[in-house]
A protein has these predicted regions:
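Substrate-engagement module of ASCE P-loop NTPases
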Residues: 10-18, 53-58
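Glycine-rich anion/phosphate-binding loops
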Residues: 1-14, 48
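Short beta-strand segments at enzyme active-site cores
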Residues: 22-32, 63-72
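Short, contiguous, pocket-lining structural segments
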Residues: 3-6, 19, 41-45
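Membrane-embedded alpha-helical bundle segments of multi-pass proteins
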Residues: 6, 13, 23, 27-28, ...
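Glycine-rich, proline-tolerant flexible connector loops at the mouths of alpha/beta enzymes
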Residues: 1-2, 31-37, 78
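Active-site capping/gating regions of soluble enzymes
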Residues: 37-189
């Protein structure tokens, strides 16, 4: 609990300093998906972290309408015996956000946090299908955007164009997920 409080304080201080410099802070309280925990445990820990982060943001007088929140999705651990399905992840994540994120936060940009490209895209789309929400739900993926293009490229100059096409495809699919219009069948197109 002390670590959560200290990290929340550091995030809030960073956000306050950014706003003082007229920079929009990206506040990233990540709960890792490493381990065997179930989705309920992730929900509880994510809720606790978000509550502490917003308490600290308020203490630091951060304007919540001037931040981007970059949290994890509420998801089972990577090594969990029973991983939650797409609709369960989406509904648990939206419920957690609804209970812990003030409506004045304009945008939530999810990190992929070790999910596969397909999982991250499907989860985002499912959440947006459940909308409207008081905040915009979007993506700020690293690995989930880059994994397939890097695999296609494999360091071979002759694969650059195919890798670029793979990146464009993944970006398009996430753009569709952003509006709730992604469908898994699109992976094959």
């Amino acid at each position: 609990k002390n670590c959560i409080r200290l990290n929340a304080h550091a995030l809030a201080r960073y956000a306050a300093l950014c706003q003082q410099a007229q920079i929009v802070p990206i506040v990233e309280p990540e709960v890792l998906m490493d381990g065997t925990h179930d989705i309920d445990r992730c929900f509880d820990v994510t809720s606790e972290v978000l509550q502490e982060v917003f308490a600290e943001l308020n203490n630091q007088q951060v304007a919540l309408n001037g931040i981007v929140l970059k949290p994890n999705m509420v998801i089972s651990g990577m090594d969990a015996a029973n991983r939650a399905d797409i609709p369960t992840v989406a509904s648990a994540t939206v419920k957690c956000l609804s209970e812990n994120v003030p409506d004045e936060v304009p945008g939530i940009a999810f990190l992929s946090g070790g999910q596969t490209s397909e999982e991250a895209t499907a989860h985002l789309s499912s959440m947006n299908e459940m909308g409207p929400h008081p905040w915009q739900l979007t993506f700020s993926y690293g690995r989930a955007l880059q994994a397939e293009p890097l695999k296609v490229w494999s360091g071979v100059d002759g694969n650059i164009e195919a890798a670029q096409e793979a990146f464009i495809k993944r970006s398009r699919l996430n753009s569709l997920a952003r509006t709730g219009n992604y469908h898994p069948q699109m992976e094959e197109a």
